[in-house]
Amino acid sequence: MSWKVVLLLVLLATPTGGLEESYLEESCSTVTRGYLSVLRTGWYTNVFTLEVGDVENLTCTDGPSLIRTELELTKNALEELKTVSADQLAKEARIMSPRKARFVLGAIALGVATAAAVTAGVAIAKTIRLEGEVAAIKGALRKTNEAVSTLGNGVRVLATAVNDLKDFISKKLTPAINKNKCDISDLKMAVSFGQYNRRFLNVVRQFSDNAGITPAISLDLMTDAELVRAVSNMPTSSGQINLMLENRAMVRRKGFGILIGVYGSSVVYMVQLPIFGVIDTPCWKVKAAPLCSGKDGSYACLLREDQGWYCQNAGSTVYYPNEEDCEVRSDHVFCDTAAGINVAKESEECNRNISTTKYPCKVSTGRHPISMVALSPLGALVACYDGVSCSIGSNKVGIIRPLGKGCSYISNQDADTVTIDNPVYQLSKVEGEQHTIKGKPVSSNFDPIEFPEDQFNIALDQVFESVEKSKNLIDQSNKILDSTEKGNAGFVMVIVLIVLLMLAAVGVGIFFVVKKRKAAPKFPMEMNGVNNKGFIP
């Protein structure tokens, strides 16, 4: 590969500049701006009839040969595709069933196209299979290799005939076999047969491997020249067409093919090409890492759940929650509108004042800190907490310095790598401006003791409400406890008083008994002779 090709690939994969990344201390997140949108707004259908020719009536009976081997490959591939076509009809019935929507995702191996796109494509394929539709398409191609055909439901499709293999078989191979049988000494004929047969065999293999629905558009399904003609015929502006022509690889990745069926010696399939009808509107990307605040061994942790791509479209903001919904080429972001969610423009407040905004910024909560690295376009967010060692490094000198506990933002201008224990993360070398927006970490607003357990994808204001309710419950519990303690104290005092009174009563009783026992006894006057005349000694 020449240095010019390498340089071209690097330029295509790297934004041309103008990116600006903001690190938000308040929420441990980054917002990267400066991207331009390329949004899919529709699909363009191209129907192909790949003509094989009359191979069924060609036979080789004069022993092994290259021609015989290639001919058997062609016949076997045609039979295999008939089986795939029959299985395809059964699978499409499942895809179109509302109860079997989950089968849609299984219909495409890589999930490049959305489920809705596959379902819509299958609906068109079912229409093309209706009696008369294939005949009408082939009729439109009788005198030309390319024509626009209108289906019975009013859908206009581009029809393309691929006759190279058929023409070779009918005009060169068949006469040669009839004359010399299959033992043709001309090696050039055998090589030519293999070359013309290659596209057909590869188309069969791709539909067979992917059960009738391919996850992308290969050069065999659609040559580059055919793709250029199809894109040029799309009902959109010249600027959008030029952008798609400049990014043909992305058009292929975002498209898919569906097998229509085998009709005699004709293989009919359709290719769905994305129409990127919205271009050059602003897009930005949000990344985040867990933000935790600790107290006495307990933690309150928050993680922004509104991460993903955002693009402006027709005055509204479209949010793409899954990173695979969008792909970056240079400074353009290719996204599928079917995967987007319209959000209010106030959602931008989550990037400015997440603690005070009334917009329901989505977060997840937890009481257990998680250490991780979130790579951003111009750097990395590092969440480093207890039990984990974190550091940044250089490809030339190794470790530069360790990182402290908490959330840190590492610019790709300051380091090449980030390490958490053993895993090493390589930072991108995309150029752009970077700056930090200071702010108090939102997690520090919460007492870890009162912080709720794990909650996923809830509004931040609900977290505040939940904590406030927890505080109120704790306050009420304390009041009840205080009143209970006071009541218990009063009850104890009454019991003590009663016991004291009883003890006092017992003491008084004992006092009088003792006093009575100590008092002198009162006997009658002593009788003697002096005072008792009747006394007889």
UniProtKB/Swiss-Prot annotation:
- What is an example of a Pfam family matching this protein? Fusion_gly
The reply on keyword Transmembrane is: yes
**Where does the UniProt entry place glycosylation sites?**
N57, N353
Can you list the disulfide-bonded cysteine pairs?
C28-C407, C60-C182, C283-C311, C292-C301, C326-C335, C350-C361, C384-C390
A single GO cellular-component term from the record reads: host cell Golgi membrane
Residues in the Extracellular compartment per record: 27-493
Q: Where are the transmembrane segments?
A: 494-514
Residue ranges in the Cytoplasmic topological domain are: 515-537
What does the entry give for GO biological process? fusion of virus membrane with host plasma membrane; symbiont entry into host cell
Which positions are tagged coiled coil?
Answer: 125-153, 459-484
Q: This protein's superkingdom? A: Viruses
Residues of the signal peptide: 1-18
Q: Region annotation Fusion peptide: residue ranges? A: 103-124, 103-127
- Give the protein's recorded name: Fusion glycoprotein F0
Q: Which organism is it from?
A: Avian metapneumovirus (isolate Canada goose/Minnesota/15a/2001)
